[in-house]
Amino acid sequence: MASRRSAAAKKEDFSFEAAATQSAHEAQEGFPSSVIIKLVLVTVAMICAPLGTYFGTLNTICGGDSSYAGALAAISVNVVLIIYLIIAAREDTGESEEERKGKEGKEE
């Protein structure tokens, strides 16, 4: 059963939609392409590294023992994650010295 909405409720719905549209637009502008490229490369590495490690070591290094090959695959995923964390920690936040000085000036 449908219920009637008052005019005030319609205005609230409109402001919510406008805020959602504005925040979605800001989110699209917020990510540099270098960050997206790094994320895609790490995602591909997280898929390919364990599969390649597992099937590459299953019959060569591990002699057919899937437990050891699986353990090496898990280690390879952890190596990829550690590399990503190091890259993310070293990455600049994108805030320049002028922006920092501007923020400090506004706080005073």
Curated annotation (Swiss-Prot):
Compartments in which it is found: Endoplasmic reticulum membrane; Endoplasmic reticulum-Golgi intermediate compartment membrane; Cytoplasmic vesicle, COPII-coated vesicle membrane
Any one of the GO CC terms: endoplasmic reticulum-Golgi intermediate compartment membrane
Pfam family, one: VMA21
Lumenal side: 56-68
Keywords on record: Cytoplasmic vesicle, Endoplasmic reticulum, Membrane, Transmembrane, Transmembrane helix
GO BP term (any one): vacuolar proton-transporting V-type ATPase complex assembly
Primary location: endoplasmic reticulum
Segments on the Cytoplasmic side according to the record's topology features: 1-34, 90-108
Regions that span the bilayer: 35-55, 69-89
Topology relative to the membrane: Multi-pass membrane protein
Superkingdom, taxonomy of origin: Eukaryota
Keyword Membrane: yes
Main function: Required for the assembly of the V0 complex of the vacuolar ATPase (V-ATPase) in the endoplasmic reticulum.
Family: Belongs to the VMA21 family.
HAMAP family per record: VMA21
Name of the protein in its database record: Vacuolar ATPase assembly integral membrane protein VMA21
Organism name: Ajellomyces capsulatus (strain NAm1 / WU24) (Darling's disease fungus)
